[in-house]
Regions:
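Amphipathic alpha-helical interface surfaces
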Residues: 76-80, 84, 97, 126
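Active-site scaffold of zinc-dependent metalloenzymes
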Residues: 38-77, 84-90
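Metalloprotease/metallohydrolase-associated module, dominated by Zn2+-dependent proteases
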Residues: 1-28, 32, 94-170
Length: 170
């Protein structure tokens, strides 16, 4: 999918979710899960390096986003948004290491996790799309947050609200 179309799709969906700066990644995931009719479970885990930083696994009862525990909060948010990008771009979940998942996530199918952890680069179109979605969301949040910092009031906050309504999700 072209970047322009991804931007339109993100803008449309995220406006429906009524998310505003400052960006709360957990709240965004909660709202996307509500819209999809099943929760999104965020799980921090010390994922071995080299390897992926995150993985999305869809099950009948919930979507799971596993993300690297051993990194900064900003990087964790980006990882989560990348995996959320797979959902928002309409990708299917990959379905990985039996022992790892059996111990940590007994209700997940080991085959599902094994396939998901094989995604380690942005070489495929789906990985680039997911990364683009994460970037679109972070760009939007950072641009509007700079216009009116989180703790600003009065004219600066009104200007940011005005821009958010006009520009939407960039």
């Amino acid at each position: 999918m072209a970047e322009r179309e991804l931007r339109k799709r993100c803008r449309r969906l995220l406006n429906e979710l009524d998310i505003h700066p400052p960006l709360d990644v957990e709240e965004l995931c909660r709202r996307v899960g509500d819209q999809r009719g099943k929760p999104i479970r965020l799980i921090a885990h010390p994922i071995p390096v080299p390897g992926p930083y995150g993985v999305w696994i869809a099950t009948a009862r919930a979507d799971y986003i596993l993300y690297q525990q051993e990194t900064s909060k900003a990087h964790q948010n980006h990882i989560i948004l990348h995996e959320l990008g797979h959902l928002l771009a309409g990708h299917t979940s990959d379905e990985q290491d039996d022992e790892l998942l059996a111990g940590l996530y007994p209700d997940l199918e080991p085959d599902a996790v094994r396939r998901a952890l094989r995604r380690t680069s942005y070489d495929t179109a789906h990985e680039r799309e997911a990364e683009t979605v994460a970037t679109i969301i972070l760009e939007w949040a950072s641009v509007l947050d700079k216009v009116a910092p989180r703790n600003s009031e009065g004219p600066a906050r009104r200007m940011a609200s005005s821009l958010a309504d006009r520009i939407g999700w960039l």
